[in-house]
Amino acid sequence: MERGKTPEAAHALLVMLKALRAVRHLALTPILKAGLGESDFRVLEVLLHKGPLPVNVIGPKVDLNPGSVSVAVDRLYQKGLVSRMESDSDRRVRTVSLTEKGRRVFLPVFRQHAALIKRAFQDVSPKERRQMEEVLRKIGKRAEKLSEPARHR
């Protein structure tokens, strides 16, 4: 079944990407106004919710590669928003935590970010949101399966 000249699945992808772009732009507004980048936000958010973490644990939790985590942590450290502590038992391991200043600066940004996302979803019922999550999860898993052979070439 074609929709104009765009296949239905491709059209659905375009709709999804446009919505994602709009919500992402909205959600980034308070982050950028606070002088933070998206990577900075991800690192601060995981530290807020999970507490102090080793640098190598942060990346997988926030979908950032190790280099991006290091750059973000360095930037946040220079701003006084995080502290870094080397492990006594293994000097290669550095644990990162939010400082009081980091918590004071980040909490209002996080609250604004969360409120904007909530407003973006206000016309979506809880049932529709659950259905959307289920469908997106299904699509994501299928796409991962389809890309597995390409990864092993």
Language model: regions and residue ranges:
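N-terminal leader segment of winged-helix/HTH proteins
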Residues: M1-A34, L81
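C-terminal regulatory/oligomerization modules of transcriptional regulators
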Residues: M1-T6, P126-R153
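Charged, amphipathic alpha-helical coiled-coil/dimerization segments
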Residues: R24-H25, D74-R137
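The alpha-helix within a helix-turn-helix
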Residues: G59
